Swiss-Prot record:
Pfam families: RNA_pol_Rpb6. Belongs to the RNA polymerase subunit omega family. Keywords: DNA-directed RNA polymerase, Nucleotidyltransferase, Transcription, Transferase. GO terms for biological process: DNA-templated transcription initiation. Disulfide bonds: none annotated. One of its GO terms (molecular function) is bacterial-type RNA polymerase core enzyme binding. It comes from the Bacteria. It is an enzyme of class 2 (transferase). This is DNA-directed RNA polymerase subunit omega. Its EC number is 2.7.7.6. Promotes RNA polymerase assembly. Latches the N- and C-terminal regions of the beta' subunit thereby facilitating its interaction with the beta and alpha subunits.
Amino acid sequence: MARITTEDCTGKISNHFDLTLVAARRARQLENGNTPLVDDVRNNKPTVTALREIAAGHIGTELLTRNK
């Protein structure tokens, strides 16, 4: 599996601050048992999985406006 970088995600969320908030909130959701939206997450930490979901376009800034 290739390494994920923030540059892979900035095409989807251009504001670095929003990117950080979205990734953190999604990682928290994954830690609390939400189902990952990308395949092959067995060795990834929740933060890496969250970034992969953002890079794939599954998660975006709409997560910031939704209720937790």
